[in-house]
Amino acid sequence: MVLTNLTKYSDFGLLIIRVGLGVTFMLHGYPKLTAGREMWEGLGGGLGLPIPVVFGFVAALSEFLGGLMLIGGVFFRVALILLIGVMAGAITYHVKAGDGFKGYAHALELLIVFAGLLFTGPGKYSVDRK
């Protein structure tokens, strides 16, 4: 009985998802962002990209700012595209490293969640609410 009434709180559910994932991505992104050039070089270099320091910095910045934007629901779909890019990079890194499914499964799961959220929108408890 109680569970059937929860659909009227779907916007609250979206808030929980946004804040939970946003905080997690900020906590993962901040150390990468503040670690400096050597970290950025490693992030970008692990993917075999040209100018690895630039791509590594962009990945770290996307992870941190994407998380922040997710929390507030501001530029929500832009944030999701940034985070999908970060997860695609993580998947690529793990596949190239030969880590197997267990190595990239978490990044794939998050990419799928972010892709789904592109269609739901941020919910009414957000800056982007309509």
What are these regions (language model features)?
Residues 1-34, 53-61, 65-130:
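Extended, low-polarity transmembrane helix blocks
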Residues 31-51:
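Membrane-interface interhelical connector segments
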